[in-house]
Regions:
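Core catalytic lobe of class I
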Residues: 1-221, 226-230, 266-269
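S-adenosyl-L-methionine
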Residues: 1-13, 233-267
């Protein structure tokens, strides 16, 4: 299921059923620039809708950067759990480079009430650990024994500082576009196949593209008609049906909804 809305997320989310979403992954406006799209969404009503539509064991992952990170945490301190540090391949803030260090990371803040799905995305190819320990005590029942520790695994659990290849200025179609690889990483971490993901500020649709590739249902909301139309083109480029139906909701004149199965076009024929 692919459902796209063009309009105000606070209005549109009221039409989403209670406890129907497994994972909310979005890049809210930080309100740190003078751009028309960078306007802070009121956080209290936003959390009210998030909490209503999210399943009891659902998870919210929000992109942020200081000072917006602090605002987000303090807007819902009881549900905040931890942060991921996303290291950028290129720094930003060149105009202030002589006054302060350039910004080379953003945050993904994790919120939930009950322990959500967590599928750690292990990295592979590390050097195995084969440490031979002489006269170590494996257990008091057997006294001192010779043992091999480490098990030879080349896998490692994820750490909270990670890096993704960032879309360049030329390839990006949105000024704050985040890598599809990042969306795929967090979707695989916090959902299972067939789960429903919401992006309440989907921009050019990267989260939806990731959901299509991974077999997740997707609900996307974007207020800016320009980027909403770009997202439609990106979904079609992924091989989704070229006959996505357009539906007008009577209760929201400013909403356009598209629905389609998240299957490749050759599966639909």
């Amino acid at each position: 299921m692919l459902r796209l809305y063009n309009g105000d997320c606070l209005k549109i989310m009221k039409d989403i059923k209670d406890k129907s979403v497994d994972f909310i992954y979005t890049d809210l406006p930080y309100a740190t620039t003078q751009n028309s799209w960078d306007i802070l969404i009121p956080l209290e009503p936003l959390w009210a809708e998030y909490n209503r539509i999210l399943k009891d064991n659902g998870c919210v992952a929000l992109w942020s950067q200081m000072p917006f990170s602090a605002q987000l945490v303090m807007s819902n301190p009881n549900d905040f759990r931890y942060e991921w540090i996303i290291e950028k391949t290129k720094g930003t803030g060149f105009l202030n480079a002589k006054r302060m260090p350039m910004k080379c990371h953003e945050n993904v803040l994790i919120f939930y009430k009950k322990l959500p799905t967590y599928n750690p995305q292990k990295t592979i190819g590390h050097t195995p650990v084969h440490a031979f320990t002489k006269h170590s005590t494996d257990g008091t029942n057997y006294g001192k024994t010779h043992s091999v520790s480490g098990g030879g695994s080349t896998e490692r659990y994820p750490r909270d500082v990670i890096q993704f290849k960032w879309d360049t200025q030329k390839s990006a179609v949105h000024p704050t576009q985040k890598p599809i690889s990042a969306a795929e990483y967090f979707i695989k971490t916090y959902t299972n196949e067939g789960d429903t993901v919401l992006d309440s500020c989907m921009g050019s649709g990267s989260t939806g593209v990731a959901c299509a590739r991974l077999g997740r249902n997707f609900i996307g909301i974007e207020k800016d008609e320009k980027y909403f139309n770009i997202s439609i083109d990106r979904f079609r480029a992924e091989g989704l049906s070229n006959k996505l139906p357009l539906v007008k909701f009577d209760n929201f004149a400013d909403i356009i909804v598209l629905e389609a199965d998240l299957r490749k076009q050759n599966d639909l024929q």
